Design a protein with these regions (language model features):
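C-terminal and inter-domain tail/linker signature
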Residues: 1-130
Length: 130
């Protein structure tokens, strides 16, 4: 679970999140960790988070788009989508660690959508990715 920076391996963590690997996910968390999904106003214990993640319908893939690290915080921006690519989401995660275990995780999930019509009518901006 550690890498050369002596901090949790967040890439492996995201692989296990996307694979819904219940057995491995628990190893990333301190037993008293708290997880917050701010967009839906939910607070989870570790077991509740793992249940919500691992019992979410479908098979999932994703791509880590950005990782930032400080002494005890990892920030990730990840694009998540079902294997059939019928939809996609972005999640920004603020992962607080202690002794290489997650003690707190604050996540902000958003649906990927088209530009709203009112902004299209303004004819401003351009696509980040196509």
């Amino acid at each position: 679970m550690e890498n050369g920076d002596n901090i949790m391996d967040v890439k492996e963590f995201w692989i296990d999140v996307l694979k819904q690997n219940r057995e491995k996910l628990i190893s990333y968390f301190h037993k008293d960790a708290v997880i917050r999904w701010h967009c839906s106003n939910e607070l989870f214990t570790v077991s509740e988070y793992i249940k919500a993640n691992c019992e979410y319908p479908g098979e999932w893939e994703g791509k880590i788009e950005r990782i930032e690290k400080t002494e005890n915080m990892i920030i990730t921006a990840v694009k998540v989508y079902p294997v059939n690519k019928s939809s996609s989401f972005h999640v920004v995660s603020f992962i607080k660690t202690e002794n290489n275990l997650i003690t707190e995780m604050d996540e902000y999930w958003a649906d990927d959508t088209e530009v709203p019509e009112w902004r299209q009518n303004m004819k401003i901006g351009s696509k980040i990715w196509i």
